[in-house]
């Protein structure tokens, strides 16, 4: 009898044991050679497929984070700006000027309607003195600054601010306190 390598084996049990050992040895070598490489190959394929997607998602996440940080900064800045606007006296003066301008416009409109009704009553003759004065009022230039509360004419904006703070600031604070009390009563 000749063995797998060309050696002659004399005993059948030894041949069986040699065959069994060689099979186990070949199987072990096969597992050592192939199994880790297959596992590493699978891991490598998984990384190759998923890594670009993960990198893209991470870059997208950083971009979103930068946008959110920018929007948060803008929002905080806007909130601080709006809160600081509550303490600017110019807006109070502008509000009073707007109220005064609206009241003046209503008075002018009422006067214009009154003149028209007088014209209709008098007839369609020559222009009356009221119509001429109306034109001169509309085209007259105004120089300086006018306090909307007391209609005092001042020469500069700084004078107007000082006048407003000294004369009308306490009245405005009192009015604000009254409005706050009224709002608290409603709650």
Swiss-Prot record:
Biological role: May participate in the coupling of lysosomes to microtubule plus-end-directed kinesin motor.
Residue ranges of the region described as Disordered: 165-187
Gene Ontology, cellular component aspect: BORC complex; lysosomal membrane
Disulphide-bridged cysteine pairs: none
InterPro entries given in the database record: BORCS8 (IPR019320), Znf_C2H2_type (IPR013087)
UniProt name for this protein: BLOC-1-related complex subunit 8 homolog
Subcellular location, principal: membrane
Keyword Membrane appears in the UniProt entry: yes
Compartment(s): Lysosome membrane
Keyword annotations: Lysosome, Membrane
Keyword Cell wall biogenesis/degradation among UniProt keywords: no
UniProt similarity note: Belongs to the BORCS8 family.
Short name of any one Pfam family annotated for the protein: BORCS8
Record organism: Nematostella vectensis
């Amino acid at each position: 009898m000749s063995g797998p390598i060309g050696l002659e084996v004399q005993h059948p049990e030894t041949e069986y044991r040699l065959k069994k050992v060689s099979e186990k040895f070949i199987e072990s070598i096969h597992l050592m050679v192939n199994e880790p490489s297959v596992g590493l190959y699978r891991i490598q394929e998984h990384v190759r497929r998923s890594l670009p997607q993960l990198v893209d998602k991470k870059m997208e996440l950083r971009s979103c984070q930068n946008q959110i940080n920018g929007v948060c900064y803008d929002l905080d800045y806007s909130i601080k700006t709006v809160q600081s606007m509550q303490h600017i006296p110019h807006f109070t003066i502008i509000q009073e000027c707007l109220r005064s301008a609206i009241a003046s416009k209503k008075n002018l409109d009422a006067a214009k309607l009154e003149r028209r009704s007088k014209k209709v009553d008098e007839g369609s003759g020559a222009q009356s003195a009221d119509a001429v004065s109306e034109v001169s009022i509309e085209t007259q230039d105004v120089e300086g600054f006018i306090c909307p509360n007391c209609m005092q004419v001042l020469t500069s904006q700084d004078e107007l601010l000082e006048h407003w703070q000294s004369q009308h600031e306490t009245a405005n604070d009192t009015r604000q306190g009254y409005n706050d009390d009224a709002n608290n009563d409603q709650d």
